[in-house]
Amino acid sequence: MAKKAKFFKNGIWYWLFIAPTLLSLIIVVLIPFIIGIYYSFTDWNGINQPVFIGLKNFMTLRDDAEFWNSIIFTAKFAVACIVIINVVGLSLAMLVTRKIFARNFMRTAFYLPNLIGGLILGFIWNFIFVDVFQTISDATHIGWLGGWLSTTNTGFWGLVIVTSWQMIGYVMVIYIAYIESIPTDLIEASKIDGANSWQQFRNVVFPLIAPAFTVSLFITLSNSFKLFDQNLSLTAGAPGNTTQMITLNIYQTAFSAQEMAVGQAKAVIMFLIIAVISVIQVYLTQKREVEM
């Protein structure tokens, strides 16, 4: 009885400690999520009383070419960001974990862009791409520097550059944590066996930091699909909504066109896409970790 009473008493304290976080999660995330799913099956403009209409909102999305184009654009953007952010982030992590001069300063410098808000970052880079690059182009007659963000292609790579510049430092920190946890004995043993730098990385380092790769891949994937503020402040979908990502398309549908229910239906589709891709990605990468 004494053990049960002690367990019950401790259990109450556990629940008391997690209750604020759990309550916040339910109020801020779970309840709005459920309400949002309900609204996706209604005719609602954000003001009038919602009227249940079943799958009509989802059926209308079949003919919404702009929405599907935004999904394709977002998918291409996500692939580019995943590759660039993880490759560069891992490379920088390998660099700053070596015994080199000013490595702590370099860690700070590489991480700093992550502390800047996405909206502000977009406006800063918009000024750089549009004004600074154009000035340099006029002075040096380098044609490709002019007209940035004026085409779909330059707008796409502008978004990739800005997002990568912001997130590389964050991913670098994740890789650093795993790299520094690798026992130095393993590295020394591989050197004694005659392994070169690439062989050490491929056969010793990478298998041990595979969990970091899983985490970083998931973060970059989800953040790339959910990106909104940089898209709004950098290109705003221009030219002609060809650089419009799925989140910006949802925003414009819900708030600019006052079609809240249709926008919510798009958000549900976006959630399903991210959920399916994330589950597959985590499953495959964890399976790869076991094989390593």
UniProtKB/Swiss-Prot annotation:
It comes from the Bacteria. The keyword Membrane applies. It is a multi-pass membrane protein. Residues 71-281 form the ABC transmembrane type-1 domain. InterPro entries: ABC_transporter_permease, MetI-like, MetI-like_sf. SUPFAM superfamilies: MetI-like (SSF161098). One of its GO terms (biological process) is transmembrane transport. Its main location: membrane. It is found in: Cell membrane. The keyword Cell membrane applies. Keywords: Cell membrane, Membrane, Transmembrane, Transmembrane helix, Transport. One of its GO terms (cellular component) is plasma membrane. The chain crosses the membrane at residues 15-35, 77-97, 110-130, 156-176, 205-225, 260-280. It holds the Pfam family BPD_transp_1. Probably part of a binding-protein-dependent transport system starch degradation products. Probably responsible for the translocation of the substrate across the membrane. Belongs to the binding-protein-dependent transport system permease family. MalFG subfamily. This is Probable starch degradation products transport system permease protein AmyD.
